[in-house]
Amino acid sequence: MSMHRVARAVASSEACAGALRGSVSRTRFLCLNAPVQRFGARNALLGAGLGAKRHFFQSPIIRSGVAQAVLEKAAADPSALTQEAIVDNLNAAERDRLRRVRNIGIAAHIDSGKTTATERVLFYTGRINAIHEVRGKDAVGAKMDSMELEREKGITIQSAATFCDWMKVENGKEEKYHINLIDTPGHIDFTIEVERALRVLDGAVMILCAVSGVQSQTITVDRQMRRYNVPRISFINKMDRMGANPFKAVEQINQKLRIPAAALQVPIGSEDSFNGVVDLIRMKAIYNDGPKGEIIRETDEIPEELKQLCKEKRALLIETLADVDDEIAEIFLDEKTPSIEQMKAAIRRATINLKFTPVLMGSALADKSVQPMLDAVCDYLPNPAEVENLALDKRRAEAPVKLVSYNELPFVGLAFKLEESNYGQLTYIRVYQGSLRKGMNVFNARTDKRVKIPRIVRMHSNEMEEVPEIGAGEICAVFGVDCASGDTFTDGGLPYSMSSMFVPDPVISLSIKPKTTKDGSNFSKAMNRFQREDPTFRVHVDAESQETIISGMGELHLDIYVERMRREYKVEVETGKPQVAYRETITEHVTFDHTLKKQTGGAGDYARVVGFLEPIEAGPNGYAPSTFKEEVTGGSISDKFLFACEKGFLASCEKGPLLGHPVLGTHMVVNDGATHMTDSSEMAFKNATQQAFRKAFKEGKPQVLEPLMKTTITAPNEFQGNIVGLLNKRNAIISDTEIGPEDFTLIADCSLNAMFGFSSQLRAATQGKGEFGMEFSHYAPAPGQLQKELISNYEKAQADRHKK
């Protein structure tokens, strides 16, 4: 094939990429402009992706200017290089290595059995020799809950990383898959741990309770998976519990999460008699034998009472696949039955393209049907080469560039989690492109500083295994790298950066100080460390009270850090009453014409600003951020002074006039003004704008906004009246109630201010059997009496400070 034909192939590259352009892809990029001589393998990959004959590009070095033009074209248009082309044209060794790698996370609602399932995965893959339960009698605790607090409370607080090898058996042959696994917390207060795990993973296992089905945090996790375009398989756990109803859970996935789903299995027995599953694809019964279910027994003998149900559920699976996969749709319309291979291939395609989630079922605690879930991870979740990852090329105005999971390309990685260890800061890195070697120099794209990698380790919960090198598509941890969570690292030759994770704003704050002054040093160390580790944990010093204020996602979130400070730094602290993150806004249009004029003998201050404030109408997602606009005509205020006006507006919005809280939903327009030849300055216009804002804001019928929390409460049915009574006292708005055979779930919007101390009252009202979770919903006007009290208290506190 001639080079001229390759060049012509570039012109048709749009067609080559058309199939993928309409699909959802994960946004992240590829080094296409490094020296051609150095990366001949890449040229082969690119050329084949653009329609060239594969054997032509097997040569190690291609120096042709036409080939370079092909590379430049692909760099300018990442869609020219499809994921199919990348997968098909990796060299044989790379393709084989990546084909057997899976980077997955386990995520779910609290108490759905994530950590218990992870413990079984580690046991069945040979990573641990014994199973320990989350709340086991031996008091050892699950392997992945390595923190003392996690084992005491029976919850996961930090995401924990590990790796294992799974020997998958297919048609009598064994094949080893390498799985990098992250177990995440289920509690909403630790949602950042789920965010940063999903940001760097290629797939996920979403665990649901067979009794409760889709719960509040399941919906949150689903939203996070969609944010990062993470394919998922679903595992319905706790099939041995009374009231287990897996097909109701499948229906809820379809209806509540709005993603097509179908069961790949039918349970053999139910509740206490749950004994195994029927594989609907191969129509085989699967049982677990051995003391811990470590032996898998398959048989063609399906229980007689299940044969009709299996036939119906298999037909439903094929019908659902026909809705999301063209190949199965054709077979279905021809009234033919797809083969096992066709069904598995369709499930894989639809899952990776985010069109479908296959549903499996089992009981981790009862050691049943966990191994088929591992097989499904290998069969249906993508390998690193099948996921489109993009970076931003700073040289090309942050245009997207594809990253390719190829060891021979220049290194690109993302630091997604920081952790303090006995050996210093531990930085978790996902390697997207190239390889990372011990002793290698890398560059931080944010700081532009060079860093040497002294040690590379693979993590197994709190244990580590040192390795000399880590390949593309893998996850590792490194020591001695000074960085922040979300930093991009490259080999120094690529001006790339990667988008970081979504970080929600804190909703609760409290003042904190060490009980004794001698603990001041350790107190500061703890604050600095916790901030580096957790982007949702914020610390600032109040300018007026000089108190240290910590902010976070909820009471439990802050309680955990206070307790960690005591245990890890031996610092006893005093905390103030929790403070709600209120906001301020106006409700009416109001004009202003304000002049700042000061004469003190020398050069004075002069600035006049004219304009108006108006409310921004609240949308479906609540109040919008405040905005500023200048509409000055005729040059009455110069550009540099208008910039100072905007700075004054932004400063005013940081600390509102009513309570000193940020301002939302307010639009300021400056449309006229005046300057003085000698007395006007940027500072004068900034101050004038702040004064005008404060005065106009108070005339615009201002309101205090309070955060409303979406609160989900689950408890036994007999306590429903007690809980409704508790919520009525708090003026909560109940939006949904779901009554199950044993428990009921209630969802309500509650004022955060009214929820302090709710956990102890809930325990008392339900004899300790109720549980609840909260996540921020939206801001709404606070009750009138509360607004008056808050404003009065703030004004009194301000007056007291001025007296001092």
UniProtKB/Swiss-Prot annotation:
Residues 99-385 form the tr-type G domain. CDD domains: EF-G, EFG_III, EFG_mtEFG1_IV, mtEFG1_C, mtEFG1_II_like. It comes from Sclerotinia sclerotiorum (strain ATCC 18683 / 1980 / Ss-1). Residues 1-63 form a transit peptide. Keywords: Elongation factor, GTP-binding, Mitochondrion, Nucleotide-binding, Protein biosynthesis, Transit peptide. Gene3D superfamilies: 3.30.230.10, 3.30.70.240, Elongation Factor G (Translational Gtpase), domain 3, P-loop containing nucleotide triphosphate hydrolases, Translation factors. GO terms for cellular component: mitochondrion. It is found in: Mitochondrion. The lineage of its organism: Eukaryota, Fungi, Dikarya, Ascomycota, Pezizomycotina. The keyword Transit peptide applies. One of its GO terms (biological process) is mitochondrial translational elongation. PROSITE patterns: G_TR_1, G_TR_2. This is Elongation factor G, mitochondrial. Pathway: Protein biosynthesis; polypeptide chain elongation. Belongs to the TRAFAC class translation factor GTPase superfamily. Classic translation factor GTPase family. EF-G/EF-2 subfamily. InterPro entries: EFG_II, EFG_III, EFG_III/V, EFG_IV, EFG_V, EFG_V-like, EFTu-like_2, G_TR_CS. Mitochondrial GTPase that catalyzes the GTP-dependent ribosomal translocation step during translation elongation. During this step, the ribosome changes from the pre-translocational (PRE) to the post-translocational (POST) state as the newly formed A-site-bound peptidyl-tRNA and P-site-bound deacylated tRNA move to the P and E sites, respectively. Catalyzes the coordinated movement of the two tRNA molecules, the mRNA and conformational changes in the ribosome.
